Amino acid sequence: MNNFKGTFITFEGGEGTGKSTQSKLLYEYLINKNINTILTREPGGCLESEEIRNILLKGNLDKWDPITESLLHNAARREHIMKIIKPALLANKIVICDRF
């Protein structure tokens, strides 16, 4: 049985299509309606995920073996889910994510 009570909304799309803008607009709208909502993003979303993101973005983009890079991305996502998304959903919050 699913114990999650909250709602997860993600905005997806190519670069420059308005994902961040629409995420922020929806977040502001829900907050103004006093609806318990958080706004987060991927890649990143929590301190640990941001640290991994920064590791991946520094220097030569081809320095990582594809499998290593994939594992780092998955580690960042796991931290984001366990530290931000899952607790918010269990607390019956709406989670808006700029990409996922």
Identify the role of each PLM range.
Residues 1-6:
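Phosphate-binding P-loop
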Residues 9-11:
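Hydrophobic anchor at the beta1->P-loop junction of P-loop NTPases
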Residues 16:
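Walker A (P-loop) phosphate-binding loop of P-loop NTPases
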Residues 19:
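Conserved lysine of the Walker
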Residues 22, 26:
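Hydrophobic positions on the alpha1 helix immediately C-terminal to the Walker A/P-loop
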Residues 29:
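Rossmann-fold NAD(P)-dependent oxidoreductase module
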Residues 33-100:
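ATP-dependent small-molecule kinase phosphotransfer cores
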